[in-house]
Amino acid sequence: MRLNPIIKKDVKVQARSFKMCVEVFVYELIMALVFFVALLYITSQNRFTDGNVYSQMVWLYPVLAIAQWVILGAVIPIHTSSAISGEKERQTFDIMMTTGMTPWSIIMGKVMTAVAQAMIFVVASIPVMALTFVVGGLSWSYLFWFIAVALLVSLFAASIGIMCSSFCRKSITAVIVSYGIYIIFFVVTALPAYLICILTDYAKSEKDMIGFLLLNPVVYITEFVAKSMTDASWIADIIGQTKSPLLNWLASGSVWMILSTIAFLAVSFLFLLIAKKRISPVSKRKAKKLAGKQMTQITEQSNG
């Protein structure tokens, strides 16, 4: 299987750059600071109690996991927002489109490069994360789920950045638009549910409310932490006792997490398709139509 040339080139350039070393160092430093601050907080809260302080160390896992997901979600759009618009600024976009690569290969190459870079950060943080498993006594399967969610966050953030980069000519504009789309997913997806609860009877509006939250990152991470740490569903607590078979099914087991993951993957794929469509060269049929219009305009001007 032939490796995507963009991935091969960009990963090599990033791996050899001093900037990458600095970014990994800063990332590790932030993770270490978060770990020690959380550790000091947990020990201070249990200093004057009879409980076992080590039983509370398990909460280091969600603290570090959420910190990393937030950093990845904030940093990746900055890198991917210049993937296409940066080529336009350097005036190399047309050269890139004349290569033998398809628009889809170009988009996937840029996205996979961003995901690979994110995984470098995640792998570099494993020693710090390992401390939470050793001290807190967690199963190592939690590490797998942490990496899986990190992959989802990276793909989702990268797809937003790539789509914005394909529409914008300036990288800074693409970054701003990317964070604007973030606000839509964080706030706008929760706002209809909140308004429904206020303006209507909560018991009658559960079905309408719950659908909006499938694409809310805060709800997704909260549900993941609740299932991981307490084996209880936060969504089930929101829904409460209901006679609706659909809502009971959503709140059972890991159904909500699975559906929400599928929804985020589908939206990410949609964003990538939009980006691919945006950078695709004009098709032959459209090119003929444009050529015909241009010839008509030239003829009219010459006759006029």
Give the role of each language-model region.
Residues 76-97, 110-111:
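Transmembrane helix boundary and interhelical loop/hinge segments in multi-pass membrane proteins
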Residues 60-86:
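Long, hydrophobic alpha-helical segments
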Residues 248-304:
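Junction motif at the cytosolic side of a transmembrane helix
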Residues 1-25, 284:
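Aromatic- and glycine-rich beta-strand/loop motifs that create alpha-glucan
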Residues 58, 62, 113-169, 177:
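Secretory targeting signals
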Residues 19-44, 69-72, 178-186, 267-269:
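Hydrophobic alpha-helical transmembrane segments of multi-pass membrane transport/permease proteins
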Residues 41-46, 51, 187-270:
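Terminal transmembrane helical anchor/hairpin motif
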